[in-house]
């Protein structure tokens, strides 16, 4: 049996973010999705996941999941045999983004989670295409499933994260970097920088996709993953 593959979802997403990948890759290996919840710091979430995962595994994170993945590599580099970073950001959060999150937290505490998620997802997450409305509804369903406290904790974790430049420079394992061509939240430039920092890395741009290529273009995403994992 091949090495286990652990997926880490983006903000307010659950295992459904990786449904096409779970279906494809569970045929040949153990696949699991670790929840990015329970703590209000990236360090805390990463430590908790490391306690519950196999001794060694392939790690794949998208967006917030990619940020957590980088912290897991920092904490336990010997346990990750291959690294996949998708539509993510290695930098500390900008002050203006943190200020926006504070306002979102206030709104969520007032019971306006759906409104906040709708305003955040529509302009930032998805490429224009036939699947957009379906994926929007799925994102809303995932957020509703996770609830207000998860939003608050994840927002605080993202706001307090630190720069992982030095972590990326030290990565020795094979690393795959994926980015949706039209990702406005974590643009291609960020992933080009990650590819430069990680010496043993490969960068692929996914066409017809924005911030969630695992759902927007699963065929292309799975094809690249399958070839790279061989």
What are these language model-derived features?
Residues 173, 187-196:
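Short alpha-helix in the alpha/beta-hydrolase fold that links the catalytic acid
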Residues 209-218, 222:
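Catalytic histidine-centered segment of alpha/beta-hydrolase-like enzymes
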Residues 93-96, 113-169:
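Conserved alpha/beta-hydrolase catalytic His-Asp/Glu region
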Residues 1-43, 62:
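Conserved HGGG/HGGXW glycine-rich cap/lid loop of the alpha/beta-hydrolase fold
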Residues 42, 74-75, 79-119:
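Flexible "cap/lid" loop of the alpha/beta hydrolase fold
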Residues 171, 177-179, 183:
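Short beta-strand/loop motif that positions the catalytic acidic residue
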Residues 61-65, 69:
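Gly/Ala-rich beta-loop-alpha elbow adjacent to hydrolase catalytic centers
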Residues 192-211:
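Catalytic histidine neighborhood in serine/cysteine hydrolases
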């Amino acid at each position: 049996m091949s090495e286990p593959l652990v997926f880490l979802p983006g903000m307010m997403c659950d295992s459904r973010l990786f449904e096409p990948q779970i279906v494809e890759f569970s045929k040949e290996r153990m696949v699991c999705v670790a929840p990015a919840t329970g703590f209000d710091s990236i360090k805390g979430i990463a430590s908790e996941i490391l306690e519950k995962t196999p001794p060694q595994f392939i790690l794949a994170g998208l967006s917030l999941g990619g940020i957590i993945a980088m912290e897991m590599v920092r904490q336990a580099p010997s346990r990750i045999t291959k690294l996949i970073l998708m539509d993510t950001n290695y930098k500390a959060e900008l002050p203006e983004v943190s200020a926006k999150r504070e306002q979102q937290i206030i709104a969520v505490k007032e019971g306006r989670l759906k409104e906040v998620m709708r305003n955040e997802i529509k302009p930032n997450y998805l490429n224009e295409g036939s699947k957009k409305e379906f994926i929007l509804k799925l994102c809303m369903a995932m957020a509703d499933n996770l609830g207000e406290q998860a939003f608050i904790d994840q927002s605080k974790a993202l706001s307090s994260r630190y720069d992982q430049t030095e972590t990326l420079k030290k990565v020795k394992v094979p690393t795959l970097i994926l980015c949706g061509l039209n990702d406005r939240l974590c643009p291609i430039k960020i992933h080009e920088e990650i590819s430069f920092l990680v010496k043993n890395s490969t960068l692929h741009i996914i066409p017809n996709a924005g911030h969630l290529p695992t759902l927007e273009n699963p065929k292309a995403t799975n094809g690249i993953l399958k070839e790279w994992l061989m």
